[in-house]
Amino acid sequence: MAQTTKKDEGILLVVSGPSGAGKGTICNAIREKFPDLQYSVSMTTRDPRKGEVEGESYFFRTNEQFEKLIEEDAFLEYAKVYDHYYGTPKKRALDMISDGKSVLLEIDIQGAMQVKKRYPKGVFIYIVPRYRL
């Protein structure tokens, strides 16, 4: 009988913290140091801003499309911020991990807690802002 080897899974790396803590700066440094690390592109219902590219900056959807995806359990995490939804597409991230690629998520703490419930074997890093007087 031929022996098969299971491909090693990638790692889900979740960087979270409050706004202004430096998540983006840290994630940019991680991506520069590890160029093979896949960045998870979020989905949103807000309008694209100048220079944003579908599938690179965000996946842009209508409220109706996003709510249908919520019903289909299509997100690792999601939240409604003011009048717009934001979320991390589950299938895309988990497919990359299954293919042996490591994935970086930059999200807020509430999102990280949702991801931890759905994918507890991820690596979770919480960024604490510097104390200022």
Over which residues does each language-model region extend?
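ATP-dependent small-molecule kinase phosphotransfer cores
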Residues: 42-103, 109-113
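P-loop (Walker A) phosphate-binding loop of NTP-binding proteins
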Residues: 16-18
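Conserved lysine of the Walker
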Residues: 23
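Conserved phosphate-donor/acceptor-positioning beta-strand/loop module used by diverse small-molecule
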Residues: 103-108, 117-133
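Post-Walker A alpha-helix
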Residues: 26-27
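Post-Walker A helix-loop "phosphate-sensing" segment adjacent to the P-loop in P-loop NTPases
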Residues: 32-40
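Extreme N-terminal, non-catalytic leader segments
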Residues: 1-13
